[in-house]
Curated annotation (Swiss-Prot):
ATP binds at G154, G156, K157, T158. It comes from Clostridium botulinum (strain Hall / ATCC 3502 / NCTC 13319 / Type A). It holds the Pfam family Bac_DnaA. SMART domains: AAA, Bac_DnaA_C. InterPro entries: AAA+_ATPase, Chromosome_initiator_DnaA, Chromosome_initiator_DnaA-like, Chromosome_initiator_DnaA_CS, DnaA_C, DnaA_dom, DnaA_N_dom, DnaA_N_sf. This is Chromosomal replication initiator protein DnaA. Belongs to the DnaA family. One of its GO terms (molecular function) is ATP binding. It is found in: Cytoplasm. Residues 327-448 are annotated as: Domain IV, binds dsDNA. GO terms for biological process: DNA replication; DNA replication initiation; regulation of DNA replication.
């Protein structure tokens, strides 16, 4: 980011700050980051689609007028949600470097500046994973290699991975650190094959010091991706480089993952993160309020921590929702306001019935399939077995009749449902990995 853009934006937000209440400014304007300025077009990074919508409908003209007051120019404002993909797209558009080799800056490593060890809230549910991550960050490739972190959605896996990257770069700015999702790794591999750039792709991921791969479970079932990642893993490991991997489940429970990869993932340390307990949820809320400079009554945070239990994203999302509700309605934050703001979220969690649709969605996601696969006529094992599990769970967790369950799975006969239920029931008596899978699926279904 150039100095002129930074200085201009800082002056603009000082003008805007004088036009808004403290709550409105901290909620909507403070989180904006300028990205680029070209031909009177200003691109601003915002944290999510909800914030983008509010800014476009309520605050865009205010920003335009503040900039016009400073520069005598009318700028076109473009709000960009800062997902990995959009950050990467922005880099491609504004980075003059044409080489695929990674350079040492925060943007090239795709690290989120907010995800550091200092901003991570430690509790009983994540203490071990945090300690392992810090040990790896302090002594890359010497403590635990690879480090495999697993846990449910929104529990802090990605935060710890980014924190490791930041810590290493802070202590050794020359380190080549790359953070990538398994989906992005796959897409880059596909493009390298299509464009005949295999060498560049391999150089990018094998000539580095630290590789952080998020959501590794998504390479399961992708033979070419697994083949390439296997050789990438070997090259880095043999060169004594650090590998950190995250997943929503331990290696032994990732379906259709090659055994040679599974065994390598188990070479180092496996650390899990569980859902936060009440004390940790309270600490997370207080940390978020402090960082965002939000004045939230303690009893409101207790209310949120009592009602929202599943993950950190939902906790922080509930807090922002309450602040937004307060700002938009011009009402003080209280338990009554919090109850009103969260009524849809809380009531849906309390009253939502388990349905076959929910079961199919969870099972399909767990096994990296599409819901249509479970309903299809295909009988390959990687589809037939998850389908049988989904039928088993449908009979266990819903009141639907056998014919109705069969109908929801592509119009199958009720005898097929009976066969699936009996097969899974019998296998559960002797198959520990299946027991773990069913336990995890039940947990995810209950969180829906």
């Amino acid at each position: 980011m150039n100095t002129h853009l930074t200085e201009t934006w800082e002056k603009a937000i000082n003008i805007i700050k004088g036009e808004l209440t403290e709550v409105s400014f901290n909620t909507w304007i403070k989180s904006i980051n300028p990205i680029s300025l070209e031909n009177n077009s200003l691109k601003l990074a915002v944290p999510n689609d909800f914030t983008k919508g509010i800014l476009e409908s309520r605050y865009k003209d205010l920003i335009v007028n503040a900039l016009k007051l400073l520069t005598s120019k009318k700028y076109n404002i473009d709000f960009i949600v800062t997902t990995e993909e959009k950050i990467e797209e922005n880099q491609k558009n504004h980075n003059n470097e044409k080489s695929n080799i990674v350079v040492n800056d925060e943007m090239s490593t795709m690290l989120n500046p907010k995800y550091t060890f200092d901003s991570f809230v430690i509790g009983n549910s994540n203490r071990f994973a945090h300690a392992a991550s810090l040990a790896v960050a302090e002594s890359p490739a010497k403590a635990y290699n690879p480090l495999f972190i697993y846990g449910g959605v929104g529990l802090g896996k990605t935060h710890l991975m980014h924190a490791i990257g930041h810590y290493i770069l802070h202590n050794n700015p020359k380190s080549q650190v790359v953070y990538v999702s398994s989906e992005k790794f796959t897409n880059e591999l596909i493009n390298s094959i299509k464009d005949d750039k295999n060498v560049e792709f391999r150089n990018k991921y094998r000539n580095i010091d630290i590789l952080l791969v998020d959501d590794i479970q998504f390479i399961a079932g992708k033979e070419r991706t697994q083949e390439e990642f296997f050789h990438t893993f070997n090259a880095l490991y043999e060169a004594n480089k650090q590998i950190i991997i995250s997943s929503d489940r331990p290696p032994k429970e990732i379906p259709t993952l090659e055994d040679r990869l599974r065994s390598r993932f188990e070479w180092g340390l496996i650390a899990d993160i569980q859902a936060p307990d009440f004390e940790t949820r309270m600490a997370i809320l207080k940390k978020k309020a402090d960082v965002e400079n939000l004045n939230i009554p303690n009893e409101v945070m207790v209310y949120i921590a009592t009602k929202i239990k599943s993950n950190i994203r939902e906790l922080e999302g509930a807090l922002i929702r309450i602040v937004a509700f307060s700002s938009l309605t011009n009402k003080e934050i209280s338990i009554d306001l919090a109850s009103e703001a969260l009524k849809d979220i809380i009531s849906s969690k309390q009253t939502r019935q388990v349905t076959i649709d929910i079961i199919q969605e969870v099972v399909a996601n767990y096994y990296n399939l599409k819901i249509e696969d479970l309903k299809s006529a295909r009988r390959t094992r990687n589809i037939a077995f998850p389908r049988q599990i989904a039928m088993y769970l449908s009979r266990k967790l819903t009141d639907m009749s056998l014919p109705k369950i069969g109908e929801e799975f592509g119009g199958r006969d009720h005898t097929t449902v009976i066969h699936a239920y009996e097969k899974i029931s019998n296998n559960l008596k002797k198959d520990e990995s299946l027991q773990n899978a069913i336990k995890e699926l039940n947990k995810r279904i209950n969180q829906k």
